[in-house]
From Swiss-Prot:
Keywords tagged on the record: Chromatin regulator, Nucleus, Repeat, Repressor, Transcription, Transcription regulation, WD repeat
Predominant location category: nucleus
Protein's UniProt name: Protein HIR2
Biased composition (Basic and acidic residues): 414-426, 495-509
WD repeats: 10-49, 70-110, 118-157, 164-203, 220-263, 276-319, 323-364
Gene: HIR2
UniProt source species: Debaryomyces hansenii (strain ATCC 36239 / CBS 767 / BCRC 21394 / JCM 1990 / NBRC 0083 / IGC 2968) (Yeast)
Matches recorded under Gene3D superfamilies: YVTN repeat-like/Quinoprotein amine dehydrogenase
SUPFAM superfamilies, sorted: WD40 repeat-like, YVTN repeat-like/Quinoprotein amine dehydrogenase
SMART domains per record: WD40 (SM00320)
Bias-annotated ranges (Polar residues): 482-492
């Protein structure tokens, strides 16, 4: 097998249809450029058999034999005549159908007729009968058109379906035996027609024999092309995009098996729309006495995948994925069955070539004839009644007559072209289904209708229904009696000589029976109608129970159901009329006791019922495993969920190299698992947390009840963090068995930050992108807007670590980027390396969110904004101010997180920067805080000593002050401040300095 993609882009980048002629010499292509190209087929076949060196030279020499430009728009279908190698037809999206003869160089417009230029819909699919006589195509106006090439007649086949609402037929195909025509529509139904030629007049006759709707549950509505294909012997027809439940299938329907599905090919999603049978029948056995026959099918579609199947195998022969860059819309085998041509919307033509007998051994001519004879014997006679009722109940014929479309009722195209539209030829698009059905009725049906007209010869006037005496047991409900008169009943056959009573719309009918007068009810709407609009049609009546049928008068009477009397008790009591009392009455009203309907009602938790936020919870997995990060990787915790009850509980097992260490069973679903330094934590679907020890699986705490399912369960060291679906945050110290912190405002304070009231309502809220905890028990949250936060236990609030504002103007942004791409994003949280940085991790998350929102890139985006801002008055020091603010926030966050190394680096950078900018007040304040109390005898010093700590982030403040003085000594503007603090701390000797 070899695959060749023709490098040239054909038809302006879109090929919509291909076909190969009878003698296997030419191939047609059509597409977007309104042209039809005729190619030499053997030139393409030779390209797949030659070597690489010669192929490059020969590809440049492949040119079309003819370029036909008869159409004025996109040509979406071309088909060769099965009996003439020089004749083909083509259709476009304007609805025009041309017949071409390349030997005579003629191009005839066969539809629409010569005088009809507008009002036609696009041609969807087109097919030739095997004898080359009939041409059928489906159009966008939900019609199927039949054209006889011998007698030049035109007719519509749509009337046989008897549907109230027609749908577009995406695919249409004749069978190879000249007996059947099949179509597939957007309504997931498959219509099968049978046809024959009358022996005397040679007129065709069509009838609908089957309507299959159980194969396809749903169909892709955005697909323009679908291709049904018949097997070479006509025994099978393949249906693409068939589906069973949620599985996409390619169904094979058998003619001899009553058009039932006998085989399904599973290999595509809902993207397989094109199916094409190989024209040869293959035999897997070399012995013709006991043949094992099979067919080869090629399937493709909008998933850009080509699959070739053997119908006797469950798995395909091969799968070619991404053979094109855009959907595949047509497939075509050559007559030898050794080459497959693929057309796609990327403008490339692909050729798949097979070696002889690579797909199998072809059957002999004798066996081929036997198959055709056996197939002819299984075809049912044309006049036989279908096995199933294919006519909808609303359209059933009362005489059980088979609807037949006869050619004698068709339109002669030559006569229609000669006449003008005003001479009685109707516009085809304006023909209603009723008129079409009237024109195409069979002779037998017309005779029966004529017989009915003679029997039921009534004057077209309204005969009112006679109201009989109601039985004594019948209810006197006026609504019930009025409703009963609107029900449709059968009419009774009257004596034709009896004169019916005339009724005018303005007067009600009064009848007398048994001495009593009866007035027939009238609709209020009928009183206001004009008498000119009350034209009454003639109705056929039949024997009934003595009541007459209501005659339609241009409007359909609406039927109503009686109103329901099932009213709630509360509404009934509120609508009861109370007894009126005088204003001066001193009588005390009796208090009605409220009935007790429920005892011991459950009191709902307001925080759960009326939560400010709702977070998504993970789906319950059938089973999952986690490797231990604290111990060796050979330790694995395995979770297998049961049914969530006592009958089949969930199982938790801890293994070491497939050896069980401990096990536990829980009658609930397990959602999340987290590992600490000495414990495992497991959360259930109902909001419980179970804790186990690493070593033996001993319970460390009774189950922790949170009341709502968990969205996040994280741990680090001895700390365990849980975030519920309503945003509640908890952190526990499992070693001390105490709560470490709890957020009273939950996560709603973070998620509500981006909610802004606008004129058209609230804006979309941000979502959580990371939820973690540090080894000090500090929760970290990042949002989709790029902001990162930590929870300060002492303040009881969230504080900002990183946001996109500092990425906008800070010089020090990305100064802590992780250059090692092999490390995970959360590497800085769960490792003890000195290179890790929590602040750097959160700033990296901010970068990712910015890049997702701006396609141009962060640098280009912010550089443009910064230049525009710096040009404005008062914003000259914008970048310096943002940079210092960013450094100050970094220093404070590192102090809270305990990041010693980052704190030292940021602090030195900060003091150097304020010295360069000449901010003496900030430098003095920083040095004064590092110096601390210096006068031991003062009262202020004694009060400050209680709150002053000699260390900050593990560094002595005096040592840090000395480093600051030495680092900034080169700045001349700040030397007076540095000398002042240098004398106090002893860096500068006072005597030597003086």
């Amino acid at each position: 097998m070899r695959v060749l993609v023709f490098p040239s882009v054909l038809h302006s980048g879109q090929i919509h249809s291909i076909d190969i002629n009878k003698d296997n010499s030419k191939i047609l292509t059509s597409g977007l450029d309104k042209e039809i190209n005729v190619w030499n087929l053997q030139e393409f076949v030779q390209l797949t058999t030659e070597g690489k060196d010669t192929v490059k030279d020969d590809i440049e020499n492949v040119k079309p034999l003819l370029r036909i430009t008869a159409h004025e728009d996109l040509v979406n279908i071309v088909k060769w005549c099965p009996q003439n190698e020089n004749v083909f037809v083509s259709g476009d999206i304007q609805g025009k159908v041309y017949m071409h003869d390349i030997s005579k160089n003629t191009h005839e417009l066969i539809f629409p007729f010569g005088w009809k230029e507008d009002g036609t819909s696009r041609v969807v699919d087109l097919a030739w009968s095997d004898d080359g006589r009939m041409l059928a195509w489906s159009s966008g106006d939900c019609k199927i058109h039949i054209y006889d090439t011998e007698k030049a007649t035109y007719q519509e086949l749509t009337s046989l379906s008897n549907l109230e609402k027609l749908t577009v037929q995406r695919s249409i195909a004749f069978d190879p035996t000249n007996h059947y025509l099949i179509s597939m529509g957007d309504d997931t139904s498959i219509y099968l027609y049978q046809y024959q030629y009358e022996p005397t007049t040679r007129n065709y006759q069509f009838r609908l024999i089957n309507r299959i709707s159980k194969l396809i549950n749903k169909t892709s509505m955005n697909v323009d092309y679908k291709r049904i294909s018949w097997s070479p012997d006509g025994e099978y027809v393949s249906v693409p995009t068939a589906s069973k439940n949620q599985t996409s299938l390619i169904s094979l329907l058998s003619r001899s098996n009553g058009w039932n599905n006998i085989l399904s090919l599973v290999g595509h999603n809902l993207d397989c729309e094109v199916v094409q049978y190989n024209p040869m029948i293959y035999n897997s056995s070399e012995n013709n006495d006991n043949p094992k026959l099979f067919n080869v099918i090629a399937t493709a579609g909008s998933d850009m995948t080509l699959v070739v199947w053997n119908t006797t195998k469950d798995k395909p022969i091969f799968i070619l994925q991404e053979i094109s860059k855009k959907p595949i819309v047509d497939l075509c085998w050559d007559k030898t069955g050794n080459s497959l041509f693929v057309a796609s919307l990327d403008g490339h033509l692909s050729i798949v070539s097979f070696h002889p007998q690579e797909l199998g051994n072809t059957v002999s001519e004798e066996l081929w004839k036997e198959l055709f004879e056996a197939g002819e014997a299984s075809i049912k006679p044309f006049n036989e009644k279908p096995d199933q009722d294919i006519t909808p109940s609303t359209k059933k014929s009362s005489h059980n007559v088979i609807d037949i479309l006869d050619q004698k009722n068709s339109i002669n195209v030559h006569e229609a072209k000669a006449k003008k539209p005003t001479e009685g030829i109707k516009d085809l698009s304006s023909i209603s289904p009723e008129e079409e059905n009237a024109d195409t009725e069979s002779p037998l049906k017309q005779d029966l209708q004529a017989h009915d007209k003679q029997v039921t010869n009534f004057v077209p006037e309204v005969i009112p229904a006679i109201i009989e005496d109601a039985p004594e047991t019948q209810t006197e409900d006026i609504l019930h009696s009025a409703m009963s008169t609107t029900r449709s009943t059968k009419s009774q056959v009257k004596n034709p000589k009896e004169k019916p009573t005339k009724v005018t719309p303005e007067k009600a009918k009064v009848t007398t029976k048994n001495g009593k007068k009866r007035i027939q009810p009238m609709l209020i709407s009928s009183m206001n109608e004009n008498s000119s609009n009350n034209s009454v049609k003639k109705s056929n009546t039949s024997e009934s129970n003595g009541t007459s049928n209501l005659v339609s008068s241009g409007k359909v009477l609406m039927e109503f159901d009686k109103p329901s009397y099932s009213i709630s008790d509360d509404l009934y009591k509120q609508n009861k009329r109370t007894k009126t009392q005088d204003e001066n009455s001193n009588k005390k009203l009796k208090r009605e006791l409220e009935p007790v309907k429920f005892i011991g009602s459950v009191v709902l938790n307001p925080s759960t019922t009326f939560a400010r936020i709702r977070l998504s919870i993970p789906k319950i997995r059938l089973n999952f495993q986690l490797s231990s990060t604290v111990e060796d990787n050979s330790f694995i915790l395995d979770v297998k969920n049961g049914l969530g009850n006592e009958t089949k509980p969930s199982r938790i097992t801890y293994f070491k190299k497939e050896k069980q260490i401990w096990c536990d069973f829980i009658p609930r679903f397990i959602q999340l698992v987290a590992e600490g330094s000495t414990f495992w934590a497991v959360s259930t679907a109902d909001g419980q947390i179970l804790t186990y020890s690493h070593t033996s699986g001993k319970k460390l705490l009774p189950p922790i009840i949170l009341g709502s399912p968990l969205s996040f369960l994280e741990s680090h060291g001895n700390f365990l963090m849980a975030v519920t679906s309503i945003g509640e945050l908890y952190v526990w110290n499992i070693e001390q068995k105490k709560i470490h912190l709890q957020s009273p405002s939950s996560l709603s304070s973070l998620l509500d930050l981006s909610n802004k009231y606008q004129e058209d309502g609230l804006s979309k809220s941000d979502n959580i992108t990371m939820c973690s905890i540090t080894n000090n028990g500090i929760p970290l949250i990042t949002l989709s807007n790029g902001a990162g936060y930590l929870f300060n236990k002492d303040l009881g609030t969230w504080q900002t670590i990183s946001e996109s504002w500092w990425a906008f103007g800070s010089h020090y942004w990305d100064s802590l980027g992780n250059d090692d791409g092999s490390k995970p994003q959360s590497y800085g949280l769960f490792c003890d390396s000195n290179d890790s940085s929590i602040v750097g991790l959160l700033e990296q998350k901010t970068n990712e969110s910015i890049l997702r929102k701006t396609r141009a890139g962060r640098g280009k985006y912010f550089n443009k904004i910064s230049k525009n801002m710096l040009m404005k008055e008062g914003f000259e020091n914008l970048e310096n101010t943002i940079s210092l603010s960013h450094l100050e926030n970094r220093i404070l966050c590192c102090e809270l997180l305990g990041e010693f190394k980052d704190f030292h680096d940021f602090f030195i950078i900060y003091v150097k920067r304020i010295c360069e900018l000449g901010f003496k007040a900030k430098l003095f304040e920083v040095c004064d805080q590092l110096l601390g109390p210096s006068e031991p005898n003062s009262t202020a010093t004694k009060d400050g000593e209680a709150n002053w700590n000699s260390e900050i982030c593990g560094i002595k403040k005096h040592d840090l002050l000395k480093e600051v003085i030495l680092s900034c000594a080169k700045n001349r503007d700040c030397q007076r401040i540095l000398i002042h603090f240098g004398k106090k701390i002893g860096v500068i000797d006072i005597d030597e300095f003086n």
